[in-house]
Structure formats: C-alpha cells, structure tokens
Regions:
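Outer-membrane beta-barrel channels and translocator barrels
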Residues: 24, 36, 69-71, 81, ...
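Transmembrane beta-barrel strands of outer-membrane/channel proteins
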Residues: 31-37, 76-80, 124-130, 176-182, ...
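Surface-exposed strand-loop-strand hairpins of Gram-negative outer-membrane beta-barrel proteins
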Residues: 34-59
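Residues that define the transmembrane beta-barrel architecture of outer-membrane proteins
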Residues: 25, 56-60, 98-106, 120, ...
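Outer membrane beta-barrel transmembrane domains
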Residues: 40-42, 48-50, 188-306
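Outer-membrane beta-barrel biogenesis signature
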Residues: 2-40, 117, 121-123, 297-306
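Residue-level signature of outer-membrane beta-barrel architecture
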Residues: 33, 66, 78, 110-112, ...
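Outer-membrane pore/translocation modules
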Residues: 83-86, 91-198
C-alpha cells in the first residue's frame, strides 16, 4: 500500500496489484515474499546519524486474478504479515512485534485495448481494501500496540487504479508503462476502544520500461522503473498526527524469467532515491520482493467439422 504506516513499514498492498488482463477464462495465481527494511532515520530530507531504530516487515502475498471477459478481470490480494520494531539504546534492546493475517484487497479492472494506438493498453480499476487483519494486538505487557504495528487497520479503503502500456514500434518486445494508484483511506473508529485513527490518503505513480530476451531457450524480462509515493498525515480523533506522512522517490530494478511457458519467477528491489518525511521518521532503506506467477489458460475449443 504498500504501506499504511507512519514509517512506510506496512504491508505492500498497492505495490502488488495490477495483474495483466488476459483472455477470457484465464486464472492467474501469484505467491510472493516481501522483505522491507527500515533502518534510516530522517528529519524531513535530512538523514540523521542514528541507527538505533530498526523496523522490519515480512509479508507473504497471494494474488489471484480471473478474466471474466477479454477486457474485464477481477483480482484479489490476501496477505500474512510479521512486523518487528527494535530500539537499541545503552546496551538494551526493546522488541515489539506482531504476526497474523493482514488486510486484503479486491479490484475490478477493465482493459481498453489499443487505447493509445497500436500495441497499447489502458486499464481502469476500482477496488476496496478489506480489513481482514487484527488491529488490537498487544505487546508482552498486554499493552495494545500503535496502529503502525498492527497486522490490520480495521478500516475500509477505496482504491482507484489506472495503468497504461505501449510496445515500441521498432522493437515489439520493448514496453513502456505507467501506473497510478490512489487510496482513499477509511477510519478505524475503535482505536484504543474509544478513539479514531485514519491513515493518510496515498497516491503512488510508476514509470517503467521493460524488454524481453531469449536466455537458455527461455524468455527473460528485465525492467527498471521509478516510483513516487505521497502520503498525507495520519489523523487521530480528526487531528493531524505529527511524524506521519511524506513523499518518496524509489528506483525499482526487476528481473523475471519463464521457468515454463505458464510459470514465471521474478525478483525485484526497491531502493530510495529521495525521502522527505513530516517531522522525524524511520524511512525505507531497501525492500526485496520475490516470487512466482502461474497462469492457467482456458482449454482451446475444439472445432466440430461436419
């Protein structure tokens, strides 16, 4: 949402939606592991010389998509998450962590083929983030942890999706793409039982280029993209919460390879180029995502010749 937290450490929902719209009847299944390391403390754009705080999020992400028609598809994302926060001071280490089912997402997408000319696609989508995860986990002392460490949010969000891609005329395997995801967040009205909490609205934009090459009798697809993320400040009881929100720019190198015609292995890194946070916050140091994509295409219809 990739991340619904003051320090960008949450489940990467928004980063992991937008599977391609395939021919009618095609199922797509994707299983990924996501590791997000935050060990950089910023005050605004200034990096502070303080590595005493560490935040790690481990996520298991399961996507499923079905092509209802050649243009319309429905996609779901289900998650499991482990969040860890470590503070080391004066030789002592304080660890808070939670694990469990995270929030999910349901997205309906429509593909306008050749919307930007020959060999192009435009996809529009509308969806919802569904609050499956717990938002009341406690530490070892029985104290309820803050919202940014909870597996879930106890709030429904509305998700707007727009993507576009176009193949180069001079090299059809070369593809330029862009994607915009806007998340309008809902409110948890039972935060600490009698308060309300709202994560900041968020927009993410991606610009990328990919190409395909034949390697060892199979296809490999390297790509590079830029991601810009802007998150507004969180709110508690209707008031802006300091040290939340900001904007970031990342570079994302990605490599995927076809193990079989219907099975793809991929891995990518997300590295920060620019971070500008509100107040003082932990900000991403690096993120690694790796996993598999499996496609089940409909059986070809047999022609009955009489």
């Amino acid at each position: 949402m990739y991340a619904q937290t003051c320090c960008s450490g949450g489940i990467p929902l928004s980063n992991n939606i937008g599977m391609s719209v395939e021919e009618k009847g095609t199922f797509q299944l994707s299983l990924n592991y996501d590791y997000n390391n935050l060990n950089t403390l910023n005050n605004g754009t200034e990096k502070l010389n303080d590595d005493s705080r560490l935040r790690i999020t481990n996520s298991i992400l399961f996507n499923i998509s079905y092509a209802v028609t050649n243009r319309l598809s429905v996609e779901g994302l289900f998650t499991w998450v482990n969040q860890r926060r470590v503070i080391s001071q004066f030789g002592n280490e304080n660890l808070d962590q939670t694990s469990g089912i995270g929030d999910g997402l349901l997205l309906l997408k429509y593909n306008f083929k050749n919307g930007l000319g020959k060999n192009s696609n435009i996809e529009l989508g509308l969806g919802a983030k569904i609050p499956f995860g717990s938002s009341t986990e406690t530490n070892n002392q029985g104290i309820t942890l803050n919202a940014d460490l909870q597996p879930g949010s106890n709030a429904w969000d509305v998700v707007y999706f727009l993507s576009a891609s176009k193949q180069a005329n001079f090299r059809p395997s070369l593809t330029f793409s862009g994607r915009i995801i806007y998340r309008s967040t809902g409110t948890n009205n039972s935060y600490f039982e009698n308060s309300s909490y709202k994560f900041g609205n968020e927009i993410q934009t991606f610009l990328g280029v990919s190409d395909q090459f034949s390697i060892l009798k199979t296809l490999a697809t390297p790509s590079i993209s830029l991601k810009y993320r802007d998150a507004k400040q969180d709110e508690i009881d209707g008031f802006n919460l300091d040290n939340t929100g900001g904007n970031w720019l990342f570079i994302i190198p990605d490599f995927s390879i076809n193990i079989k015609p219907n099975l793809v292995f991929s891995t990518r890194a997300e590295l920060p180029l620019y971070s500008n946070v509100d107040g003082t916050q932990l900000t991403p140091t690096y993120r690694i995502t790796t996993g598999f994509l499996f496609k089940i295409k409909p059986k070809s219809k047999l022609l009955n010749l009489r």
